[in-house]
A protein has these predicted regions:
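Short alpha-helical transmembrane segments in multi-pass integral membrane proteins
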Residues: 1-24, 78-145, 189-246, 302-368, ...
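N-terminal transmembrane alpha-helices
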Residues: 8-40, 44-45, 61-73, 77, ...
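Transmembrane helical elements of multi-pass membrane transporters/channels
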Residues: 19-38, 141, 175, 204-208, ...
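Helix-terminus/linker motif at the lipid-water interface of multi-pass membrane proteins
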Residues: 29, 33-51, 120-129, 185-192, ...
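Small-residue hotspots at the loop-to-helix junctions and early N-terminal turns
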Residues: 47-58, 135, 139, 198, ...
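Small-residue-rich hydrophobic transmembrane alpha-helices
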Residues: 50-110, 149-168, 274-340, 371-395
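Hydrophobic transmembrane alpha-helices of multi-pass small-molecule transporters
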Residues: 62-65, 179-183, 209-213, 286-289, ...
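Short runs within selected transmembrane alpha-helices of multi-pass transporters and secretion channels
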Residues: 71, 141-160, 168-176, 197-212, ...
Length: 451
């Protein structure tokens, strides 16, 4: 799905947008529902297991999000080249993305394997010994999977960049089905607990990476690696990728580090609060499915528009995708608000943890409708235009000034408990939304030279 021949006409028809969006919606739904099933299966092992997986996953997300920023950079560059109809440079940039991801993910995985216990102690401090034991087991196996999830994310981003979101959907389906089947076999069949959950995740990621790399080499794929020599690192395409990837990586990294600081604060509230927070995070992702879907769709659409020099269309499609995201979020959050008392019973939580979980999710539903899309979908339009430094600056300042600092104030000074942690996040969203809306309206985000 690339620009049409007449640049003055719409670059994306309604049919083309639908073809891009529906597999992304299904992919996000699969990812979230399978993730919830994963949490439910681990919950059968006990609250210590849920807590350990939640803590390690917050660290895993930090690492994966930093590395995924490179995939975002590669997708922006590739989509702009495709919008300019320069498939040769688009293909070369794709090859360079795979090289950068392969090298960086292996390096990070090795460091985490060698220093696993030290890293966990530094990040989470003193936690229950059972939680630490489970956490180290889960973290070690997670580290082995980093190269595979990195390559999968890179390949998925490149397929989306060309409008072929069906392949990334199928890869996600493969990964999640294997993960759930593996959980059923290893956790319940062989009684392997947290180790079984980690192994199932690893196997799923291996298959997803192999599948998407195999699909990448299809002769009809404009972003396939045409020559093995194209994988040799080259300065110019790598610098183009890093011009988006480094600011996005710093943004993602500082964002996740901030979340880890908040997780450390949450861990002081007790095992029930940790478990309630873990389930609330898992369940709230259900309501975010429309927003995440539009966030993924924004980069290829806006990237191709700007690569073709169509700034007005970039603005128009940005507003359209943002409107779809807000409408979808209103529907899913309203539904979850009323269903939450029933949903929380699925997770084998104590009465105290269930009450805390339901309370914070209800507040989440209200704020998400009005502020989530402008906080996380809209900035992807800015990134697609090469405005990654601005989104980085806003996200880092807002994250630390509001989410982190206010969370500590709300918990330690006002004794608001888990609710205080979540209200720090809501105020962060409001700040981001205001900054990104003003930046978008002024149009400076479209003035960057990316390729």
């Amino acid at each position: 799905m690339t620009a049409t021949a007449k640049s003055q006409g719409p670059l994306f028809t309604k049919r083309a947008l639908f073809t891009l969006i529906w597999p992304l919606l299904l992919e996000q739904t699969l990812s979230v529902t399978m993730g919830m099933a994963d949490t439910l299966m681990v919950a059968g092992v006990g609250e210590a297991a849920v807590s350990s997986v939640s803590l390690v996953d917050s660290l895993n997300i930090l690492i994966i999000q930093i590395l995924s920023a490179l995939a975002t950079g590669g997708a922006v560059i590739a989509s702009q080249y495709l919008g300019r109809r320069d498939e040769e440079n688009a293909s070369r940039s794709a090859a360079q993305l795979y090289s950068v991801l392969g090298i960086s993910t292996v390096a990070v995985g090795v460091v985490c394997l060698l220093l696993s216990r030290l890293i966990l102690r530094m990040v989470f401090g003193s936690i229950d010994e059972d939680v630490m034991r489970f956490a180290q087991q889960y973290f070690l196996i997670s580290a082995v999977s980093y190269p595979f999830i990195g390559l999968y994310n890179g390949g998925a981003a490149l397929f989306r960049a060309q409008g072929n979101s069906r392949i990334s959907m199928l890869a996600s389906l493969v990964m999640n089905v294997i993960n759930i089947a593996g959980n059923a076999l290893l956790i319940y069949g062989f009684g392997m607990g947290v180790i079984g959950a980690a192994l199932a995740t690893l196997i799923g990621r291996v298959f997803a990476a192999v599948f998407i790399l195999w699909q990448n080499q299809d002769l009809h794929n404009p972003l396939r690696v045409q020559h093995f020599a194209d994988l040799r690192p080259r300065r110019r395409p790598i610098m183009q990728i890093l011009s988006i990837g480094i600011p996005s990586g710093l943004e993602n990294g500082m964002f996740q580090i901030g979340k880890l600081c908040v997780s450390s604060l949450t861990s002081t509230l007790g095992t029930s609060a940790i478990a309630a927070n873990a389930v609330a995070n898992s369940v709230s992702t259900l309501a975010n499915i429309p927003g995440n879907t539009m966030s993924l769709a924004t980069i290829p659409v806006i990237g191709q528009c700007l690569g073709a020099g169509e700034k007005k269309q970039a603005q128009r499609y940005s507003v359209m995708l943002l409107g779809i995201a807000i409408t979808g979020l209103a529907v899913t959050n309203a539904a979850l608000f009323f269903l939450m008392p029933e949903v929380v019973t699925w997770f084998n939580l104590s009465a105290e943890a269930s009450a805390m979980c339901t309370h914070v999710v209800h507040w989440f539903n209200l704020f998400s409708i009005f502020f989530w899309a402008t906080s996380f979908t809209l900035p992807n339009a800015l990134r697609a235009g090469g405005d990654a430094k601005f989104t980085m600056s806003v996200s880092i300042v807002s994250m630390w000034l509001f989410r982190v600092i206010l969370s500590y104030i709300f918990v330690l000074q006002f004794h608001l408990g888990l609710t205080g942690v979540w209200f720090g996040m809501f105020i962060d969203w409001i700040c981001r939304s205001l900054c990104f809306l003003v930046r978008f309206a002024r149009g400076k985000w479209m003035e960057h030279k990316v390729i």
